[in-house]
């Protein structure tokens, strides 16, 4: 009887369940979208119960549609949209407020106040993160401050906090396990990444009671079992958890110090495994935990690009220059260059290494001869320039020259982007056969814990290269193009509307 690992990939717009066999191949996929809530400008929220029902639905569907029995599931791995915050009543199981999503800016005033009080460096030193609404800690404080009676309930021990992984494990285990893993804990602004425990000083600054917080566990461990009524009467081990970007790093088999992966999703996320060393960044990168496994924690440097694949959606839906995302490749390759056009897609500001929230998108170098093809090509190239910005920051901070870049996410199907990426960073770009690396990483973590795979070496054999893109551009051309990009970014930052 063939066994499988069931991976739950709980994302920002949809929940998916993916079955993996022992070769790391996909045996079935189910997906369900759920509603986004925007109660005020800049606020983004989800209904945590709706997320839970979407996860139940895709688990059921992937098993039923692929003629798999529940007793063929060797273990469950969970990967999740990071930072999104749920606070719920531990007796009723009901959330006391919507889940506040990682994108939501509703805690800006809390962050500003803590900065004004001089605590930014304290948070940076202990957590490796910036004091930003992106992370979970200020979201918990906001809920406790703004939901009537919440603070009193929390102090009485009646409320629980969790990121989405914690919420799902608690529900799947029938309220038995209130846990998170090192990678998710490291995104809360409340976890000391050096001492590997919740930090009392930070909790005091955020006024968050410690009794709300989950127990922090390794990323690969049996945390509990599914309660029988949620899983066809079976008690299946819940055995792997990691935040989405860290799961992708693991799914790309980036196990060695200096290994790097880049995800081209709605935004872009680059992570470098820095081994057992938490590298302090001087270049606007985040220091975070990659994963904890076998009693050992691996750290990572992370760079965030706010607009990556969403720039292609903008070409399609906003400007109507293309009918489908793949069409952008054929337009881009009809011309040999952009003829000096640069697109800086700072629609919501600039991420690493600039961290300029006030910058807005700009286009430079237009002439009467500029055509649609040049514009589309310049937009695609912007993904690659931003990636080089992050990679240079990583090399500078870590002292490691990146030897190859493993890639995943929707935009990696675009061969033009992959080749230009290799050219502009002067590094080989490796596209894997299985591009569902986030879900695969969660499956690998769960599989290790239940003995489905024996070791990381065993897993690395399952990583297969689909195509390698080697740099072909000469150095003079590469540096000239990149200098133009840096000038365009500088001009974008100078021009700001009031």
From Swiss-Prot:
Entry keyword set: ATP-binding, Glycerol metabolism, Kinase, Nucleotide-binding, Phosphoprotein, Transferase
GO CC term (a single one): cytosol
Binding site for ATP: 12-14, 266, 309, 313, 410
Keyword Cell cycle among record annotations: no
Activity regulation, short description: Activated by phosphorylation and inhibited by fructose 1,6-bisphosphate (FBP).
Pathway assignment: Polyol metabolism; glycerol degradation via glycerol kinase pathway; sn-glycerol 3-phosphate from glycerol: step 1/1
Enzyme class: transferase
InterPro entries: ATPase_NBD (IPR043129), Carb_kinase_FGGY (IPR000577), Carb_kinase_FGGY_CS (IPR018483), FGGY_C (IPR018485), FGGY_N (IPR018484), Glycerol_kin (IPR005999)
Alphabetical list of CDD domains matching this protein: FGGY_EcGK_like
GO biological process: one example: glycerol catabolic process
EC number: 2.7.1.30
Highest taxon above the source species: Bacteria
Pfam family, one: FGGY_C
PTM annotation (Phosphohistidine): residues: 230
Binding site for glycerol: 82-83, 134, 244-245
Binding site for sn-glycerol 3-phosphate: 12, 82-83, 134, 244
HAMAP family, A to Z: Glycerol_kin (MF_00186)
Role of this protein: Key enzyme in the regulation of glycerol uptake and metabolism. Catalyzes the phosphorylation of glycerol to yield sn-glycerol 3-phosphate.
Protein family: Belongs to the FGGY kinase family.
Quaternary structure and partners: Homotetramer and homodimer (in equilibrium).
Protein's recorded name: Glycerol kinase
Lineage, top ranks: Bacteria, Bacillati, Bacillota, Bacilli, Bacillales
Name of the gene this protein is made from: glpK
């Amino acid at each position: 009887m063939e066994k499988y690992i069931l991976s739950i990939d709980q994302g920002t717009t949809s929940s998916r369940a993916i079955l993996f066999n022992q070769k790391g191949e996909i045996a079935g996929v189910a997906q369900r979208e759920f509603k986004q809530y925007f109660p005020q400008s800049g606020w983004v929220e989800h209904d945590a119960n709706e997320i839970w029902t979407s996860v139940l639905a895709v688990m059921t569907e992937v098993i039923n549609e692929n003629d798999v029995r529940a007793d063929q599931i060797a273990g469950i791995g969970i990967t999740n949209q990071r930072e999104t915050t749920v606070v719920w009543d531990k007796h009723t199981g009901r959330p006391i407020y919507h889940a506040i999503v990682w994108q939501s800016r509703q805690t800006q005033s809390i962050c500003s106040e803590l900065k004004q009080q001089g605590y930014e460096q304290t948070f940076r030193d202990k957590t490796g993160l910036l004091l930003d609404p992106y992370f979970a800690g200020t979201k918990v404080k906001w809920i406790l401050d703004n939901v009537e009676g919440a603070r009193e309930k929390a102090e009485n021990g009646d409320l629980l906090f969790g990121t989405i992984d914690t919420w799902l494990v608690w529900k799947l285990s029938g309220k038995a396990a209130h846990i998170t893993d090192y990678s998710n804990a490291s995104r809360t602004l409340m976890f000391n990444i050096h001492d590997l425990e919740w930090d009392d000083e930070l909790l005091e600054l955020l006024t968050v009671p410690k009794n709300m917080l989950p127990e922090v566990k390794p990323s690969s461990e049996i945390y509990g079992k599914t309660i029988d009524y949620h899983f066809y009467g079976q008690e299946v081990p819940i055995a792997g958890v990691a935040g989405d970007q860290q799961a992708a790093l693991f799914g790309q088999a980036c196990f060695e110090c200096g290994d790097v992966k880049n995800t081209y999703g709605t935004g872009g996320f680059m992570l470098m495994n820095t081994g057992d060393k938490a590298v302090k960044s001087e270049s606007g990168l985040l220091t975070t935990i990659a994963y904890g496994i076998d009693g050992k924690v691996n750290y990572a440097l992370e760079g965030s690009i706010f607009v990556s694949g969403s720039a292609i959606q903008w070409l399609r839906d906003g400007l109507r220059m293309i009918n489908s995302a793949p069409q952008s490749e054929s337009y881009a390759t009809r011309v040999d260059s952009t003829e000096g056009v640069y697109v800086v897609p700072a629609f919501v500001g600039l991420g690493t290494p600039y961290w300029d929230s006030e910058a807005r998108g700009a286009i430079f170098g237009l002439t009467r001869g500029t055509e649609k093809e040049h514009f589309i090509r310049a937009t695609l190239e912007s993904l690659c320039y931003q990636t080089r910005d992050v990679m240079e920051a990583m090399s500078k901070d870590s002292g490691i020259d990146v030897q190859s870049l493993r890639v995943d996410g929707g935009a990696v199907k675009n061969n033009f982007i992959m080749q230009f990426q290799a050219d502009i960073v002067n590094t080989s770009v490796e596209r894997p056969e299985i591009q569902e690396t986030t879900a695969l990483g969660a499956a690998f973590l769960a599989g290790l814990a239940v003995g489905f795979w024996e070791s990381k070496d065993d897993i690395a054999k399952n990583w297969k290269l689909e195509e390698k893109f080697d740099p072909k551009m000469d150095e003079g051309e590469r540096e000239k193009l990149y200098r133009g990009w840096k000038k365009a970014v500088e001009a974008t930052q100078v021009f700001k509307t009031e």
